[in-house]
Curated annotation (Swiss-Prot):
This is SAM50-like protein gop-3. GO terms for biological process: mitochondrial respiratory chain complex assembly; protein insertion into mitochondrial outer membrane. It is found in: Mitochondrion outer membrane. It comes from the Eukaryota. Belongs to the SAM50/omp85 family. Keywords: Membrane, Mitochondrion, Mitochondrion outer membrane, Transmembrane, Transmembrane beta strand. Signal peptide: none annotated. Associates with the mitochondrial contact site and cristae organizing system (MICOS) complex (also known as MINOS or MitOS complex).
Amino acid sequence: MSEKTFHKAQTIRAKASGVPSIVEAVQFHGVRITKNDALVKEVSELYRSKNLDELVHNSHLAARHLQEVGLMDNAVALIDTSPSSNEGYVVNFLVREPKSFTAGVKAGVSTNGDADVSLNAGKQSVGGRGEAINTQYTYTVKGDHCFNISAIKPFLGWQKYSNVSATLYRSLAHMPWNQSDVDENAAVLAYNGQLWNQKLLHQVKLNAIWRTLRATRDAAFSVREQAGHTLKFSLENAVAVDTRDRPILASRGILARFAQEYAGVFGDASFVKNTLDLQAAAPLPLGFILAASFQAKHLKGLGDREVHILDRCYLGGQQDVRGFGLNTIGVKADNSCLGGGASLAGVVHLYRPLIPPNMLFAHAFLASGSVASVHSKNLVQQLQDTQRVSAGFGLAFVFKSIFRLELNYTYPLKYVLGDSLLGGFHIGAGVNFL
């Protein structure tokens, strides 16, 4: 009996147009813990494929989706002809399930540019349907701590990208921009999904955060008078359109995201915050990439309560308006930054891929931003009158879609007396950059 030969789906796709197909079976090889009902939900659409070209396309979509929802670490679709029918096919998925338990240690750079060490552990596909539980502890060289534990449950189905998650975390951080420390204990429930035939991304979050602000002896009175315990319950709703080819340093596409946070039903915090993010990127001749980012925030207190200093708008640092101290743009009292009730920021970038081309880029930028006081009577005028501008050049390093690292020489071009200027070479690291 001759040995059966499998062929990768992409090798026959060019010849598949117009060839009728009937899927007689879908088989999985390498399954140990994944539940049968989860697999059926993921591949049921294959039986509706009308021709071989559609079957090849759908098989690859299914293999990719199995990995993206956390059911498999790796999945490859192989298509074989059926011995009992000329138009019959059998789809075989060669899969590798996630490890039952993972743990690791990694060193890196925090959002504020501080070196940190993270310990993480997790269990994937806990119940055989893509569920995951992860824990992480992070410590920075400046003494910040953060511990969190999260659980996520995907909704399975043909090309369905939605999930619910729950997170508990405790963090202790120093905020040098207003000379204080903050402790946070929080519980967050979130839903992530898609609307309008997967063209619109949708996220809803319910936050319950117990915060303790500890002002140092160097903090201004405006900070010290808000020290102590506060409780914030808030609801966040965000919608976005994202056509970028990758989320970190895209070479083409746009992102448009609008988010609104409402706090005030319970707790001490009472406000409405609106945030608009816009990003666009396009390739230029000679391999250059032109990109631009814009962000606008508006914060309005509800009732007679003043918006707490922890909830205000901040700008400054290596992730937005480079060349200025972290979160130091805006109204100040003595040596403490008090944040604001509105902010605008925009950055224009020019990139040139180096070697390796998808990871290392030459980078030049022009950034601008301003923050208006929470007590401002004319937000637009104050935002216009207090513009900060900086320019610079350097290198940008992107590791897959995990983080971005920048080394820039920055020069502040326009500033306000009393600003914390940081010209020269600086490192920025994180995920969300303007």
